[in-house]
Amino acid sequence: MKKYKALHFGAGNIGRGLISDIYMKNNMDFALVDIDKDLIEKLNKQKSYSIIDFQTNKVFQISNFKAFSIDQEDEIKKWIEQADFISTSIGWSNLASLKKFFENVKLKEKAQIICFENGYKISSFFQSILNIDSNHFVNASVDKIIPNFKSDSLDVYVESYYEIILEQKNESQKKLNFVNYSTDLEAYINKKLFLVNAIHSTIGYLGYLKKYTYINEALNDQQILFKIKRLAKIINEILSKEYLLFKVDYLNDYLEKNLKRFSIKENQDLISRVARNPIQKLSKNERYFLIYNLVKKHNLEIDILLEIYKSIFYYDNKMDKESSKIQSTIENKSLAYALKKFSNLDQEDQEKILKSLAKK
């Protein structure tokens, strides 16, 4: 049987630590593309690396792959034309930079394009950028914690748990093993986006305010945990109202499972990693705005959500470009101006945040 081929943009943690693993377990020929030339050179020179489960110490070897620098346009285009699966994990705000690779290129008839990105239906968003037949695009929900361990090694340390759910479009669709498929992907995207991504980053922002370094440290703080539980209660109410397949008890269990994942000491998940790119996290196809919209729709308590928004605007990390942009806007203009520019909140809710600060 002829092997499927896959091309993946993004040789970072998710690309090396999850997507390559899936492609290799599916016995596929695959290639990685990245903007980091040193990383690509290392991958080509070493020709293999290990994925190490930090919970069980199991090791899985990744090998027999190709690796291309982003400036190897001709090679990348050849792979795009030959690929059965084309995927990304570069951050959805960077997807427009890939448009040139799809110009004057003929995809295979049943080629699938999958964006393994945090956000709402990002593959559909990518389709709007490329303006290619939507039948090629498969939306995805992907969940795995892969911390940034400081090391010169290509090896990746990962948690045991992972979940990938892909959109089931039709019966003739080529399927990957070791992933799940659903015809109701929106429900699963939002469940993961709200109860994994939003909860995770919120722990980060609240933890930063109390000067913690790691997520597990912040989660041991009872004041932070209390706020997380308040936010989660609202989220669970939203999800159970929006999607009949989710009962509140199931969502509570799902939350507790995720809190246990986040609290694993060996994880060593840096708050600076989890809280990065706050402007992106506040955008309209991301976690906080989607929760905000549904809170307004169902007329639920909004105070805890606005408190979380406030903590995001207090996040001041000089090493993070988006955080620095927010802070310089506050410094050079005002918090009111920054809220208007970045929060996407209604005017009345921006004013509630400002009034809550004025009372202090």
Swiss-Prot record:
Stored HAMAP family: Mannitol_dehydrog (MF_00196)
Example of a GO biological process term: mannitol catabolic process
Family the entry assigns: Belongs to the mannitol dehydrogenase family.
Binding sites annotated in the UniProt record for NAD(+): 6-17
Catalyzed chemical reaction(s): D-mannitol 1-phosphate + NAD(+) = beta-D-fructose 6-phosphate + NADH + H(+)
Organism (species): Mycoplasmopsis pulmonis (strain UAB CTIP)
Keywords carried by this UniProt record: NAD, Oxidoreductase
Gene3D superfamilies reported in the protein's UniProt record: N-(1-d-carboxylethyl)-l-norvaline Dehydrogenase, domain 2, NAD(P)-binding Rossmann-like Domain
EC main group: oxidoreductase
Any one of the GO CC terms: cytosol
Enzyme Commission code(s) on record: 1.1.1.17
GO molecular function: mannitol-1-phosphate 5-dehydrogenase activity
Name of the protein: Mannitol-1-phosphate 5-dehydrogenase
Domain of life per record: Bacteria
